[in-house]
A protein has these predicted regions:
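Glycine-enriched alpha-helix->loop->beta-strand junction motifs that scaffold or abut catalytic
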Residues: 211-216
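Short, acidic/polar
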Residues: 14-24, 199-207
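Divalent metal-dependent hydrolysis catalytic cores, especially in the metallo-beta-lactamase
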Residues: 22-42, 57-63
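Metal-dependent catalytic neighborhoods of phosphoester/phosphodiester hydrolases
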Residues: 42-51
Length: 233
């Protein structure tokens, strides 16, 4: 069975509407696809409602974000087959939606000052499916204005980069990673540590493995392979 267990749609920071992903997967010869958008139950709900589409088995998932305060790094946890009625999961998603939007709107105000032709309303068009304005949506609006030729370009790093820090970067406060783990477990999810080298999380990963706190590790992903190639950890 060939599948992709880590995907994003316009339910978070992806660029393709969720209903189009299964056909794209089928054309690639995949038979399974996990819909795992950031800190939302929207994609998991879609997968529960459409267990098979275009011949592809859809796996309900969510990628939850936490923070390793000991090492000052974000952590992404893929959670498969979560109980969407879990109060802790819903609370996590609600909090992250509010915090992300607050940060994104602050970034937009600063970008409006830098580029007078840009308007926040243009970027908000890309948040219609998710209810959350992500940096990718802001970049798509800037691309429409001819200010860049893609999402993850030089302008993205100038505005939102980490090292050096982008001039318009505002990051939400993330819950502690162990709190997020507890949320995932409360939802009955299978928990997989996503791309551990991307945010330099190998020390934390070793701790969690030793504790038996996670069910798996994402060993292959595009961002993971790039991080490995550039020896970020």
């Amino acid at each position: 069975m060939a599948g992709d267990l880590h995907t994003h749609s316009t339910c978070s920071d992806g660029s393709v509407p969720i209903h189009r992903l299964p056909l794209m997967a089928a054309r690639l010869g995949l038979s399974a696809l996990a819909l795992s958008d950031h800190d939302t139950t929207l994609s998991a709900q879609y997968a529960y409602d459409h267990p098979v589409q275009d011949g592809v088995r859809l796996i309900p998932a969510a990628e939850l974000t936490g923070y390793d305060f000991q090492r000052s790094h974000r952590v992404h946890l893929l959670t498969f087959w979560p109980d969407l009625d879990c109060p802790a999961l819903r609370r996590h998603c609600d909090i992250m939606r509010q915090r992300r939007n607050e940060c994104a709107l602050q970034s937009c105000r600063e970008i409006e000052a830098l580029y007078p032709q840009f308007r926040t309303e243009q970027a908000l068009e890309y948040a219609q499916d998710s209810g959350v304005l992500f940096k990718s949506g802001i970049m798509q609006a800037l691309q429409q204005l001819g200010l860049c030729d893609g999402i993850y370009t030089g302008l993205y790093h100038e505005l939102f980069g980490w090292e050096p820090r982008g001039k318009c970067l505002h990051s939400p406060t993330y819950p502690p990673v162990r709190e997020v783990l507890a949320t995932a477990k409360a939802a009955g999810a299978v928990v997989v540590f996503a791309h551990p080298t991307v945010y330099k999380s190998m020390p934390l990963l070793r701790e969690l493995v030793a504790e038996g706190a996670i069910d798996g590790i994402e060993a292959v992903s595009y961002t993971h392979l790039r991080a490995h190639e550039t020896r970020e950890d």
